[in-house]
Regions:
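C-terminal soluble interaction/assembly domains
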Residues: 324-333, 339
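Alpha-helical scaffolds flanking conserved acidic
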Residues: 96-97, 344-346
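Post-cleavage N-terminal segment of exported redox proteins
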Residues: 2-25, 39-41, 48-79, 137, ...
Length: 364
């Protein structure tokens, strides 16, 4: 009799357990929806179809239109995801290094160190470029080795001097992270996170790093006046006396070209563009950086050899060093600009009017 009651008890327990397992779960059952719930058995009509909100890149007076790749339109969802990835050390092999470590916001997304340090504590061999108005660049890296922001974002992940990771490992980590799974679904409507979409998101974020609110911008709008020293520096900058405008003219303050500006004699320790093109006349040439926010982006040049703007001006004032590929624009090579002390002070005063404090302080 006791055995009979025992079996009835066991049977009842199993029956209750089975009924519990069969309790229907309401949710979205459409696997193509953003909020798909694989555990749902009854569709409750909550499915959200994939759609993104375009991020409006502002049209800026004096700036050309930014060219956005057709296969990577800028969206609010993509920018949010890209910013999270940019700040997340999950991309590095040991989860200790993020993009932001070598491109710090308070330094206009550059590095105050001469060379950045990777996860192994090994220094790189070039100064980290400032990420400012990069959406208008035609090529990337000091040597022009990348032709798009998307292409450029691939390299630091696997570089042994930087994040020293593999894309296989990055993809595995991201696909095991439910927050990232949801964010990539919202931005790109994908279920499996791959390297192509990682760099697309980062590139979208980088295109939003726009600076156009410096003192000089306000001067051009007629909102404020320059000091006499700043105005004198402005005149020097745009004259043959200062010779700056040839490479740093227009409101972008760069020419999207490569120049040998007389830093070294031959043989070059760093071939720059020449290493990429294998053309001898390109040896020693490096990409012209923008002068916007130059006050925040020391040290200067591709190898960070100059610690101050005064040192940079003195380099051009002295005429630089001769080599067979030195740029023709260095007209006064061997002679120098021969600026007076006051003229150098005025020129630096003008360069500092290109500083955009909102860019480095804005939390949006």
């Amino acid at each position: 009799m006791k055995e009979k009651y025992f079996f009835i008890l066991i049977f009842s327990f199993l029956l209750i357990s089975c009924k519990k397992d069969l309790i229907p779960i309401n949710g979205c059952t459409d696997s193509n929806a953003i909020n798909y719930n694989p555990n749902a058995s009854i569709d409750d009509g909550s499915c959200l179809n994939f759609s993104t909100n375009p991020y409006q890149i502002p049209s800026i007076v004096g700036f050309p239109l930014m060219k956005i790749p057709e296969n990577n339109p800028t969206t609010i969802e993509g920018v949010i995801l890209g910013e999270k990835l940019f700040n997340d050390p999950i991309l590095s092999a040991d989860n200790t290094l993020a993009c932001i470590n070598c491109h710090q916001k308070e330094f206009s997304f550059s590095d105050p160190n001469q060379f950045s340090f990777g996860i192994q504590g090994i220094a790189g061999n070039r100064q980290s470029s400032a990420l400012i108005n990069v959406g208008w660049n035609n090529s990337f890296n000091w040597d022009g080795s990348a032709n798009s922001l998307e292409e450029q974002a691939f390299e630091p992940i696997t570089n042994p001097l930087e994040m020293n990771n593999t894309w296989q490992n990055v993809e595995e980590k991201l696909n095991n992270n439910q927050e990232y799974k949801q964010l990539f679904k919202q931005a790109f409507n994908i279920d499996y996170i791959d390297s192509n979409h990682v760099v697309k998101a980062i590139a979208q974020f980088e295109r939003t790093l726009i600076s156009n609110e410096s003192k000089f911008d306000k001067y051009l709008k007629g909102e404020i006046l320059l000091t006499q020293s700043e105005f004198n520096g402005y005149a020097i900058f745009n004259s043959e006396k200062g010779d700056c405008f040839h490479c740093h003219g227009t409101n972008m303050f760069m020419d999207n070209l490569f120049h040998n500006n007389g830093l070294d004699t031959e043989p070059f320790q760093d071939l720059g563009l020449g290493k990429i093109t294998n053309i001898q006349s390109d040896n020693g040439k490096f990409k012209t950086p923008t002068l916007r926010n130059i006050e925040f982006t020391a040290p200067y040049m591709h190898d960070g050899r100059f610690s101050t703007l005064e040192e940079v001006i003195e380099h051009y004032n002295s005429g630089g060093k001769y080599s067979s590929t030195v740029d023709p624009l260095m007209k006064k090579q061997g002679v120098g600009l021969q600026l007076s002390n006051q003229e150098k002070i005025d020129l630096i005063a003008y360069l500092k009017t290109l500083s955009d404090y909102n860019f480095i302080e804005d939390n949006n």
